Amino acid sequence: MKLQSLPCYCATLRQAARAVTALYEEILADSDLHATQYTVLQALKLVPNLTTTDLAVALGIDQTTATRTLALVRKSGLVIDTPGSDRRERCWALTSAGEAAFRKLKPRWEAAQTAFEKRIGRAEAEALKKASYLAATKLAAG
C-alpha cells in the first residue's frame, strides 16, 4: 500500500515529519548522533548557555524530551551543564568535543538538506520551511 493523503493537518504533518526524519537519519546513520541530537548541538551552537526550558521552547519540544536528549548528548561528552540563576535551572553549552562533532557532521547535515531539496524541489523546500515555522510560531503562541 502507498502513503495515503489524509484529510487531517496533524496526520499529514506527522507523515511528512517521519519521512524527513528518516531521510536525515539515513544520512547520519553511521555517526554516533541522531537527527534530534544534532539539532540540539545546532541550537546550542547558535545560542550557547540556554536553559533546558529555553532550549525546549526554541526547538518546539516538551521539557521531558529536551531533558532526555540533553542527558544523551551530555553522556557522550558533547555538552556541559552549569547552574543557572536558581538551583533548579541548568544552562547548557557545547564542549570542545561537541564543537568538533558539530563541525564533523555539518557536511552530512548539509547533504541531507540537499537531498531533501532534490526530492521535493528547492522552492518547495523553502516554502515548506517557511510555512512550517509560521504554523509552529502561531500555534505555540496560542
Question: Can you describe what each PLM-predicted range is?
Answer:
Residues T21, A71-Y133:
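Charged, amphipathic alpha-helical coiled-coil/dimerization segments
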